[in-house]
């Protein structure tokens, strides 16, 4: 092998994705529609419109979250009341009221800290906003990446009517379902599967009590 060919091989190895597969597609923030902006596909916009107008409560939703990398399952729950929310994911608790925003542990094993420490749930693959706004972000990204027409449908999830859309994307089919009140009912993409298991249009006031 000539010295020039060997050098070219080294360069190609260091930039493997560029030499073998071409430049990877990248969606910049500028190309993804902002929150509240329709994407122009009626099937997708029907779901986005509800996610963007999620209820302020009262509402309580319970979920099961499958993180596909590692195949681990964790519980999650959302309690909403106007001006307040309590979100639990695995052993992390995110509490927000009119006067505070803190992160605690569900079992009390660690103390509370000011603000939302999303690193506590980084291994789960979702954030405290998973129940609406973060799912809307995912859907807008998938809307840009879809490789075929989106399919609209309806479903009944946890005994609640849901509006759904299935999107063919490069790694399979992404599924999004939302309740009429804007809470996510199902999200199934390449990273996670979030499944609503119970819903109630009431909330326990103790959900918003700060731990002693």
What function would you assign to each model-found segment?
Residues 56-64, 81-88, 157-166, 181-186:
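Short, hydrophobic/aromatic-rich segments at coil-to-beta transitions
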Residues 8, 15, 100, 108-109, ...:
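Secretory pathway export signals and precursors
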Residues 18-20, 103-105, 111-113, 163-165, ...:
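Sequence contexts marking disulfide-bonded cysteines in secreted/extracellular proteins
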Residues 137-151:
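A short, amphipathic edge element
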């Amino acid at each position: 092998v000539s010295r020039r060919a060997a050098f070219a091989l080294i360069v190609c190895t260091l930039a493997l994705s560029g030499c073998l597969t071409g430049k990877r597609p990248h969606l910049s923030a500028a190309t993804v529609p902002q929150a509240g902006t329709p994407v122009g596909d009626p099937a997708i916009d029907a779901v986005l419109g509800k996610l963007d107008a999620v209820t302020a409560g009262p509402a309580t939703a319970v979920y099961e979250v499958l993180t596909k990398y590692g195949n681990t399952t964790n519980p999650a729950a959302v309690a909403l009341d106007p001006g307040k929310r309590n979100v639990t994911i695995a052993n992390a608790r995110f509490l927000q009221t009119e006067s505070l925003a803190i992160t605690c542990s569900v079992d009390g094993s660690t103390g509370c800290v000011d603000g939302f420490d999303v690193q506590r749930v980084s291994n789960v693959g979702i954030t405290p906003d998973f129940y609406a706004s973060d799912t809307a972000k995912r859907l807008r990204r998938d809307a840009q990446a879809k490789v075929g027409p989106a399919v609209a449908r309806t479903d009944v999830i946890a005994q609640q009517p849901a509006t759904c859309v299935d999107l063919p994307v490069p790694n399979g089919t992404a599924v999004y379902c939302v309740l009429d009140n804007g809470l996510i009912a199902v999200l199934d993409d390449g990273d996670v599967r979030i499944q609503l298991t119970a819903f109630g249009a009431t909330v326990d006031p103790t959900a918003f009590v700060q731990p002693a």
